[in-house]
Design a protein with these regions (language model features):
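Compositionally biased, intrinsically disordered or flexible polar/acidic segments
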Residues: 1-194
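Serine-esterase "nucleophile elbow" of acetyl-processing enzymes
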Residues: 13, 173-244, 261-272
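Beta-strand-rich extracellular modules
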Residues: 103, 149-151, 491, 503-507
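Short glycine/proline-centered coil/turn motifs in the loop regions
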Residues: 105, 456-459, 494
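Beta-strand signatures of extracellular beta-sandwich domains
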Residues: 112-114, 462-466
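Alpha-helical cap/lid subdomain in secreted, periplasmic
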Residues: 256-403, 407-414
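Pro/Thr/Ser/Gly-rich low-complexity, intrinsically disordered linker/stalk tracts
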Residues: 429-459, 507-531
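Recognizes extended acidic, P/S/T-rich segments that occur
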Residues: 464-497, 507-515
Length: 531
């Protein structure tokens, strides 16, 4: 519920705000050494707004779009440049009710009122008539920047709006504390909720409830306050969780697309806001996502400000590390540099920090090597319809990986905030050998495969399958499976008599082997016995 929290401030007097002129007269550098250069802004201060007199405003808008690199649409640089008069006021990053009156239009014109780069109001200005509008702006930084421009017409960048700002006042809006604890997640693909057809890919945001709800059960609905189809709200015996994580987003694109604005419009005092970015910002060939390292700190600080100024509580979270094969030391990379910025901001600002990056490094060192292939999207061919040829993804998480990170986040929350309780699963001390393990020949388009299946163990996190020569025990391959089935394609050079050894795993605990053998008929495969 919104409430007014004080007297309205007139931004046209008292020196609270200032007027500036902005333009983008020169073309950007474009692609230079793998980084796209946009047009540079030229800004001249007009005056401080002292006496309350009307402000003459001009406005013009034009858009530009680059060509894609190598046909990749994600490399397209798009920019909307708004030129003319801007009113700028330094204000707390909270919710403000804005009242603005415009007049002095020279002709009837359809215009857009823009605040902090996001269009807020469309209206028609007419000669000899004043137009007053009121609206609420959830500021996502400690600054309000307002301009008015013509509604953009394709191919027409020459139209210049001339109008008069006769009144501009703001009044702080407060929100009541929510009836029950709430957690908002602003993050990227490693947190996002995924659909069933995208499995086994998963995000930790969709598993957080598992560790925060006493019965590990949640009612899951689409978050109707978000326009992203992946957004979900989790309701159960614990804090309500709004997972607004979305793939391919950085601090920049999350804000530019209005997603931070949408989230902040729902945040109330006392809410916890989890903020995890630092991956897509490093993509120099993705201009809409990229944030140079030397600019990243100010973006993180803006997010922290926008939560703190609402009397809500931010918690910064580092990204999980990239996949590295067992036995190798993970080299220092650019992701670490961005993570370090978030760690420093958290320390300097005194806000909570969950260093998933460090926690995951420690966890992986303690786990058997094959756990890495179960945590990351390292999929063998023919196992999942969404990835028929397999996948070797060093960033994104499986259901097991996402659940593992969710546990780290939940325990970090409990250590940082009163009233948060973690309901961890019992430690598995023993696993039985998988039951009903069988191997059957399965004909496929280009030959034959062996279909393996077994009874699922709810305590197991993943399974390891070792394929070997039934006579000599020579190991041909070792696979990891997240589900109680596996389709194995014959390998050149393997014997036709195959033995499969299956073990179930939970952390460092493994079961005894379950064995299954199969003999492939000679007419089914071009395999040559090399043993």
């Amino acid at each position: 519920m919104l409430e007014l929290a004080g007297d309205a401030q007139n931004l046209l007097c008292g020196g609270v705000a200032r007027a500036v002129k902005r333009d983008y007269p020169n073309e950007g550098s474009g692609w230079v050494e793998g980084v796209y250069g946009f047009r540079a802004m030229v800004e001249d201060e007009v005056r401080a707004l002292e006496d309350g007199s009307p402000l003459s405003m001009t406005g013009r808008v034009f858009a530009e779009e680059s060509q894609p690199l190598d046909g990749d649409a994600n490399t397209i640089a798009r920019a909307t440049y708004r030129c003319g008069t801007f009113v700028i006021a330094d204000l707390p990053a909270c919710d403000w009710r804005v009242r603005a009156t415009f007049g002095g239009a020279r002709r009837e014109e359809r215009v857009e009122l823009v605040v902090n780069d996001l269009p807020r109001i469309r209206m028609t200005l007419r000669p000899d008539t004043s137009k007053t509008v009121e609206f609420v702006v959830p500021l996502d930084r400690r600054r309000l920047e307002l301009c008015v421009v013509p509604v953009e017409m394709p191919g027409d960048s020459s139209r210049v709006l001339r109008a008069e700002l006769q009144e501009l006042s703001v009044e702080r809006v407060s929100r009541q504390r929510a009836a029950r604890p709430r957690i908002f997640v602003a993050a990227d693909s490693t947190s996002q909720t995924y659909f069933d057809y995208e499995r086994p890919q998963s995000g930790w945001g969709e598993w957080l409830y598992w560790f925060l709800y006493s019965d590990h059960a949640a009612k899951v609905d689409h978050d109707i306050t978000s326009d992203a189809k992946q957004s979900r709200v989790f309701i159960g015996n614990g804090p309500t969780i709004f997972n607004r994580g979305l793939g391919g987003r950085s601090l920049k694109s999350y804000r530019d697309e209005g997603r931070l604005d949408s989230l902040l419009s729902q945040v109330c005092p006392g809410d916890i806001c989890l903020i995890q970015f630092g991956c897509n910002e490093t993509s120099t060939n993705r201009p809409m996502r990229y944030i140079p390292l030397d600019e990243y700190r100010s973006w993180v600080e803006d997010y922290v400000d926008s939560v703190c100024d609402r009397d809500a509580v931010p918690c910064l979270i580092t990204e999980s590390p990239l996949y590295v094969e067992a036995g190798r030391t993970r080299p220092h990379g650019v992701f670490d540099d961005y993570a370090q910025v978030a760690i420093e901001v958290a320390r300097e600002r005194g806000v909570a920090m969950i260093d998933v990056r460090a926690l995951m490094d420690q966890y992986l060192l303690a786990m058997p090597g094959q756990a890495r292939d179960a945590i990351y999207m390292r999929l063998e061919p023919m196992q999942y319809a969404c990835h028929p040829t397999g996948l070797k993804d060093p960033i994104h998480l499986t259901t097991f990986g996402a659940k593992t990170v969710a546990g780290m986040v939940a325990r970090g929350l409990a250590a940082s905030f009163n009233g948060i309780q973690v309901y961890d699963e019992p430690v598995v001390e023993r696993l039985d050998a998988p039951a009903q393990f069988c191997a059957l020949i399965d004909r496929i388009v280009s030959g034959a495969a062996v279909a393996l299946s077994w009874q699922a163990d709810p305590r197991a996190q993943y399974y390891v399958i070792e394929k070997r020569n039934a006579q000599t025990k020579r190991v041909y391959a070792r696979y990891v499976s997240l589900k109680p089935e596996f389709l194995d394609r014959m390998l050149p050079g393997q014997n036709r008599d195959i033995e499969y050894a299956l073990t179930a795993w939970a952390d460092t605990v493994s079961s005894a082997e379950a064995l299954a053998t199969v003999t492939l008929p000679s007419s089914d495969s071009p395999c040559i016995d090399m043993d």
